A protein has these predicted regions:
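A short, amphipathic alpha-helix used for macromolecular contacts
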Residues: 1-25, 72-73
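Extended, low-complexity cationic-aromatic segments
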Residues: 12, 61-146
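Major-groove recognition helix of helix-turn-helix-like DNA-binding domains
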Residues: 26-38
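C-terminal anion-handling pockets and recognition modules
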Residues: 29, 74-78, 197-238
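Short Lys/Arg-enriched helix C-cap and helix-to-coil transition segments
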Residues: 41-57
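RNase H-like polynucleotidyl transferase catalytic core
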Residues: 45, 102-111, 176-196, 212-213
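Acidic/histidine-rich, metal-coordinating catalytic segments
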Residues: 82, 153-167, 195
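RNase H-like two-metal-ion nuclease catalytic core shared by retroviral integrases
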Residues: 114, 161-162, 169, 185-208, ...
């Protein structure tokens, strides 16, 4: 196919029809047919070129089942972890306005503030989190690990990405000293779509950034905490 498009847009389908059938169909008609056939315009998932499909397949078919088997044998709990952050000048979502009158959001020129958080999401929807404003370091990460095991009633099988901090020597040493309470399992590289905590991160950002922008660090923290606590009460949401 000689179509200059990475996605099946109406224009791309129009070109395909012209190539295969010799018919120049109006773009509006193409959209109507796509709608009738059950197709809707969707934002594509992003996957890194560096992702190894074989590694992903092996993880799904062998490594994750092995983790589940061990969890069952040791009466533990599987959870997923990830880090994320929110800036005060970010905004998400759309708002209605008359045609040709794009809505505006007024932002301050004061220095922006940022809040980061680490979250843990169990297979049963249990959410645990910790906020921080500094750069993620092994020390910060270990503080969260200590909080996790302090509140855990069973051994935690925690699945995370391959962030350098997760693989640092101090973290490895700490984990070796607490192996009976928690173990870390790495996801395949460049595979955020395998981590359900990504959905939690998106939910938090959508909820926080749907409110009026703020330049107040305390207010931004309060909004993040409020939304995460709401998710803690809605285990079926994520």
């Amino acid at each position: 196919l000689h179509i200059d498009s990475t996605l099946w847009t109406r224009r791309a389908v129009q070109e395909l029809i012209a190539q295969q059938c010799g018919v120049k169909m109006p773009i509006r008609t193409v959209g109507e047919y796509l709608r009738r056939w059950g197709y809707t315009p969707q934002k594509p998932l992003k996957r890194a070129y560096e992702q190894d499909p074989k590694a992903v397949k092996h993880w799904l078919e062998y490594e994750y089942p092995s983790i589940k088997q061990r969890r069952q044998e040791e009466c533990g709990e599987i959870a997923w972890g990830d880090e994320s952050g929110l800036r005060s000048d970010e905004h998400s979502g759309r708002g209605y306005a008359p045609v040709g009158q794009t809505p505006e959001i007024h932002l301050s020129h004061k220095p922006r503030v940022r809040v980061n958080f680490i979250a843990s999401l169990s297979n049963q929807g249990t959410v645990r989190f910790m906020l921080y404003t500094c750069k993620l370091t092994a020390k910060v990460f270990i503080i969260f690990l200590e909080r996790l095991i302090r509140k855990a009633e069973r051994k935690l099988f925690w699945i995370v990405d391959r962030h350098p901090v997760h693989r640092s020597e101090s973290v490895k040493q700490w984990l070796a000293e607490h192996k009976s309470e928690i173990e870390l399992f790495p996801l395949p590289s460049y595979s955020p779509e395998l981590n359900p905590t990504e959905y939690l991160n998106c939910d938090v950002k959508q909820g926080v950034h749907s409110k009026p922008p703020t330049r107040n660090l305390t207010q931004l923290k309060d909004r993040v905490i409020s939304h995460l606590r709401k998710l803690q009460k809605l285990p079926a949401r994520i």
